[in-house]
């Protein structure tokens, strides 16, 4: 698996993250989300139960052959060793690794042999994006998010979009956006320069639990931009 097909797809990439139940995962798939995310960082509010993780993984694999566009499972990690990430990725059948800490993504990608989504904080981490060789974009997807992630903190979208435009709008620098996204504002986010996809967790929850209506509406509103 690589990001080539995702980057060349007609519509935006939509990821629903922080999934902790088979019901929510099925809803995300039924809504046509492209990426399903599970938190593999120990001790977090949205950390997935190992049994549920494997059930979601089996569901994604089963749907991959029956849906018009392939769906992939993303495991989110933060400052965990390469060995731990590889073990969990193998146990859960993860397709894409998302690194949400200070990990050197190229080192991890080479060790894991999996595509990587790398969380970047704006403007601190822009140099990481600028220094990424264009030939690596099939293995690397940048994601602008807050430092902690999953907090609902709204990023300064306009500054990020303006920065991308200042670079000349290069396709190799296109990125996913997270932070404060909701069914109500996702369409606006996808109008910004450089945004190739969106990543949501808290924005599709009610009282800390995944809300099926919000998942459906979020994906539907995002896909309207295709």
Curated annotation (Swiss-Prot):
Keyword terms: Amino-acid biosynthesis, Aromatic amino acid biosynthesis, Isomerase, Tryptophan biosynthesis
The protein's annotated pathway: Amino-acid biosynthesis; L-tryptophan biosynthesis; L-tryptophan from chorismate: step 3/5
UniProt superkingdom: Eukaryota
GO biological process, one term: L-tryptophan biosynthetic process
InterPro entries in the cross-refs: Aldolase_TIM, PRAI_dom, RibuloseP-bd_barrel, TrpF_fam
Name of this chain's protein: N-(5'-phosphoribosyl)anthranilate isomerase
A molecular-function term among this protein's GO annotations: phosphoribosylanthranilate isomerase activity
Catalysis performed (reactions): N-(5-phospho-beta-D-ribosyl)anthranilate = 1-(2-carboxyphenylamino)-1-deoxy-D-ribulose 5-phosphate
One family name in Pfam for this protein: PRAI
Family note: Belongs to the TrpF family.
Enzyme class, UniProt record, top EC level: isomerase
Gene name as annotated: TRP1
CDD domains, alphabetized: PRAI
Entry EC no(s): 5.3.1.24
